[in-house]
Amino acid sequence: MQLIEKAPAKINLSLDALYQHTDGEFEWQMIMTSIDLADYVQITLQDSPQIEVRTSKGYLPEDKRNLAYQAAQLLRHRFDIKTGAIIEIDKHIPVAAGLGGGSSDAAAVLRGLNQLWHLGLTEAELAHIGLSIDSDVPYCVYSETALVTGKGDQIQPLGDLPNFWMVVVKPEVSVSTPRILHALNCDQITDRPQTDRLLAGIQQQDAQQMTAAMANVLTPITNQRYPQIDYLMQRLTAFGAEKAQMSGSGPTVFGICRQYSRAQRIYNSMSGFCREVYLVQPLKK
């Protein structure tokens, strides 16, 4: 048996850290959406008990370091599955970009094997299992616009966003998320997103109100280490984006436009600064 699961990239429309738990984990409040830039994960069952991962990018790990591999092994051991699977990942999402590519691949494996192994798990149950793999996996199980709270495990779907385009730009730097989070002090945050206003903008389908309320509290930390990220955000707004922001811990940034023609011009302009530039839209449910 075989199936193909789409694994969309995620974008942080807002990212706020409310406080740090005694175990070192943060209490998050984020609004996330998925975009029409995606990996494709083909899963084929096999009689042997092995989990095999193959990727279209030769430099990616295909062993237990790969989150998709971890997802398959986790389900297999938890439910005492005797068979194995071949997982082939066609990569399109930039790697180490703050777009949740690895987490989305893992979530796709959870969804796919839930069907192929006839486990009958709900999205909420898959999300709970996924939290032990990576904090972005619970959201990626749903892959729709949502308010994400707790340690990343509490997902509240919000419905579709108002219509707009995004120009997504990934600079040629790699950011270590643990290093960024290690430098995060919740008591020193000054520029937080206006989450209630952002939620209202989504509910009212008001893109202008929505973008005015967006922010990412990790931006100053990442900018300090990688000033080219701030430069790219300045370029996005200079070329006409209504809002420019970093996704996750970076390094990827994105600009929002309500008009396709303007977004296309920004895309063309930014392509002169970076090799990895994408013109995308948020997914509709």
UniProtKB/Swiss-Prot annotation:
Span of the signal peptide: none
Metal-binding recorded as keyword: no
Q: Which parts of the sequence bind ATP?
A: P94, V95, A96, A97, G98, L99, G100, G101, G102, S103, S104
Q: Name the gene.
A: ispE
Protein name, per record: 4-diphosphocytidyl-2-C-methyl-D-erythritol kinase
Q: Indicate whether Lipid metabolism appears among the record's keywords.
A: no
Q: Where is the active site?
A: K10, D136
Pathway assignment reads: Isoprenoid biosynthesis; isopentenyl diphosphate biosynthesis via DXP pathway; isopentenyl diphosphate from 1-deoxy-D-xylulose 5-phosphate: step 3/6
Q: Which domain of life is it from?
A: Bacteria
